[in-house]
């Protein structure tokens, strides 16, 4: 190596180190995603508030052991309906650090599979959640379990909850090509009034 190339190589090394530092997660922007509702575009029988992805229960009575539902969207942002959409496909409930998960076996869900809230990336007996938690948001508003051809769909019927003022519908996966568009097209919305109740 000649003395004339040493400054060039030293400068190149400094530039490479600077580039690596910029690419480091420590230097990446760390703004957390904003929570909001995953809401059906069509309001169905709830013209005043529509239906949102919901974990069954309320307050200290959240039921992670039961299937998720499409529940009429609550005013503001309650913990059991507040989700963030992660870049790699998780639909995460930040208050509980749980992710929307298709009920399935061997990493595969079938049409009609329920949705449950499980630990993000969970690996436990009979639950390899990673492939059952990655969703793709299609341009038409459908939310597909990645690579499955199955889309998040609300049931055709609604019923009252413990309060006559509230309604719920079953929530499951249906073939994207045959799912009723009014019950399978979703949007991410941020409510104007934030409630943040647990």
Regions inferred by a protein language model and the residue ranges of each:
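Intrinsically disordered, low-complexity segments
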Residues: 1-2, 22, 179
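Bacterial N-terminal signal peptides that target proteins for export
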Residues: 2-15
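Bacterial N-terminal signal peptides
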Residues: 13-23
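Lectin-like carbohydrate-binding module/patch detector with strong preference for beta-trefoil
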Residues: 28-198
